Amino acid sequence: MRIGATLLLRNQNCVQSYSWSNIRPLGSLQIAMDSLEEYECDEVSIIRPVRAKDSIESFSKDIEAIRLIKTMTPISFGGGIRTLEHLELLRDLPVERLIFSSSFITKNKKLINKAKNLYGQQAIQCLLPIKIIDQKIFVYYCNEAKLISINKLDLSFINNFANEVVLYDISNDGLRDSFNEQIADSLSYDYPKLVLSGGIGKETIKWARKKGFASVLVDNKALHREYSINEYKNA
């Protein structure tokens, strides 16, 4: 099982997120990547935490920041890849995987197929930001900045077009050892297809490794030495 980290990128700099809403400045993207490489992180997912409104200008500036990164750590990128124009801007970007969220919710087959043709099926990830309310599962639909019932999603479409599905527990974003196991157990996907994020800690990793999940992504804590990736690898 891979043990990676999530970095949130806003205005070309990293930010910390708590409970999917509280944002705090973190600093330089390169410095964050250097720290994660030092901690022997298996992979890094760089995500732009965009909500309903975004612009090509903002997207382009963030892309250029990623293009300048110097690292040997495999990178996944997502956040705001909504059109073929966005996809075209990613050419020659030093990333191994692309992360789509709203495009899977709206079943934008044209965009996802184009990405698959350019990068390969193995490069396509679907991000589902999930929140459980009164035992019901909701997914955050970033394009419209609102929660929708998971029943509105075509899970078969996601299964067919995504190589991996990232389950992001947004209620426990920024916390430790609090990932809601019900999220993974409630979906009909095989564990080796799933990546877990939000509320990841040592005990979560032990459980995830035993179950056979593909990967876990530690959030903000991974940049603090006391919560470094090496600590989690020894869980």
Residues covered by each model-derived region:
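Conserved anion-binding
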Residues: 8-22, 91, 95-173
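Short, acidic/polar
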Residues: 24-37, 83-89, 145-158, 205
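Short loop-to-alpha-helix "cap/lid" segments that border enzyme active sites
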Residues: 63-64, 138-167, 177-195, 200-204
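Catalytic domains of carbohydrate-active enzymes, especially glycoside hydrolases
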Residues: 32-47, 93, 158-165
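Catalytic cores of alpha/beta
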Residues: 65-97, 181-216
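Glycine-rich, positively charged N-terminal anion/phosphate-binding segment
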Residues: 27-34, 54-66
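Glycine-rich phosphate-binding active-site loops on the catalytic face of alpha/beta enzymes
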Residues: 51, 88-89, 93-111, 166-174, ...
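Hydrophobic faces of well-ordered beta-strands that scaffold small-molecule active sites
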Residues: 2-9, 44-46, 75-79, 98-100, ...
